[in-house]
């Protein structure tokens, strides 16, 4: 599937302006996500409850407040917060060129790719090659989602990486950990260097490492699907007093067998016997049939789509 751009930008340095498209460098859709379900298998909704009254608060009536003292807030309206936001701009202004290795990776935030847009191929390639030759990267300002961000534009073999950076106050200092530095002997250091040399590789190969936990979860999901340990949302409206799903289906079969002695369901709207509360609607909608419907457990298991 072709990559989809998330923004059209203009990378500006000096009198040169490069039209580019922005792409996310990571794939969040590959994550394994679970839904929260009620005991009957239906989805649940999140509600916000007032701590003072216990009443449900609708999102449309909520306010935003900053707690400056315990249980004391200053409240802002949506318009007040909007006025404080930075105006979004498609122009990414390069403000400096610095050695690429001078940025500690601890400041790396979200990573993007940028690719040339129409008529941007030559200046894009020029910037990519110039950065690679110089061993430098570009620092730029980018106004997005109401906030100005600092980004690093660095070259790679295939193009330019657009790396969002954290601000200084977003990164903790290791000095706060008060790490004690202990002297080591020359022989200890030599032995450690030998161990490092023994395990040295030329480069990092991402394909050599896998998310083992994700693999175990996906395998467990497949086993449950193949074993038909599946809760269907189609029966989420059945009252709880009907019992477990398997008991409910047995009761339905029994009701159909008992009703066949009296009169087959010639009129689809006629009520069938109701040994289990709440089953009248389920039997009323069935077409006349000489045999019981298949149990959901007999249906082929759904195959989980993998990306």
Swiss-Prot record:
Keyword terms, alphabetized: DNA damage, DNA recombination, DNA repair, DNA-binding
Biased composition (Low complexity): 257-267, 290-307
GO BP of this protein: DNA recombination; double-strand break repair via nonhomologous end joining
InterPro entries to which the protein is assigned, alphabetical: Ku70/Ku80_beta-barrel_dom (IPR006164), Prok_Ku (IPR009187), SPOC-like_C_dom_sf (IPR016194)
The UniProt record lists the keyword Iron: no
Region (Disordered) location: 257-307
Highest taxon listed in the record's lineage: Bacteria
Ku domain residues: 11-179
GO MF annotation terms: double-stranded DNA binding
Complex and partners: Homodimer. Interacts with LigD.
NCBIfam families, alphabetized: Ku_bact
HAMAP family: Prokaryotic_Ku
Family: Belongs to the prokaryotic Ku family.
Function: With LigD forms a non-homologous end joining (NHEJ) DNA repair enzyme, which repairs dsDNA breaks with reduced fidelity. Binds linear dsDNA with 5'- and 3'- overhangs but not closed circular dsDNA nor ssDNA. Recruits and stimulates the ligase activity of LigD.
Name this polypeptide is given: Non-homologous end joining protein Ku
Gene that encodes the chain: ku
């Amino acid at each position: 599937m072709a990559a989809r751009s998330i923004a059209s930008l203009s990378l500006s340095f000096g009198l040169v302006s490069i039209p580019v498209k922005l792409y996310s460098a990571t794939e969040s859709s590959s994550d394994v996500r679970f839904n929260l379900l009620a005991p009957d298998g239906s989805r649940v909704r999140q509600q916000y409850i007032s701590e003072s009254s216990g009443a449900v608060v609708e999102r449309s009536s909520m306010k935003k407040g900053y707690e400056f003292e315990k249980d004391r807030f200053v409240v802002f309206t949506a318009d007040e917060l909007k006025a404080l936001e930075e105006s979004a701009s498609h122009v990414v202004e390069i403000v400096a060129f610095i050695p690429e290795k001078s940025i500690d990776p601890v400041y790396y935030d979200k990573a993007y790719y940028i690719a040339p847009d129409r008529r941007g191929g030559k200046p894009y390639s020029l910037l990519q090659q110039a950065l690679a030759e110089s061993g430098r990267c570009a620092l730029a300002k980018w106004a997005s989602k109401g906030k100005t961000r600092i980004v690093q534009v660095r070259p790679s073999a295939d193009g330019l990486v657009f790396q969002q950076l954290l601000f200084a106050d977003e990164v903790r200092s290791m000095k706060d950990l008060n790490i004690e530095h202990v002297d080591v002997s020359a022989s200890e250091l030599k032995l450690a260097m030998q161990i490092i040399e023994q395990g040295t590789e030329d480069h990092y190969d991402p394909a050599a490492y896998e998310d083992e936990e994700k693999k175990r979860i996906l395998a467990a999901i497949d086993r449950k699907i193949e074993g038909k340990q599946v809760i269907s949302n189609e029966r989420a409206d059945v009252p709880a007093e009907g019992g477990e799903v398997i008991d409910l289906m047995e009761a339905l079969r029994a009701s159909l067998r008992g009703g066949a002695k009296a009169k087959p369901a010639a009129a689809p709207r006629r009520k069938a016997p109701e040994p289990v509360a709440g089953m009248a609607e389920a039997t009323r909608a069935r077409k006349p049939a000489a045999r019981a419907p298949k149990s959901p457990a007999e249906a082929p298991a759904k195959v989980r789509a993998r990306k």
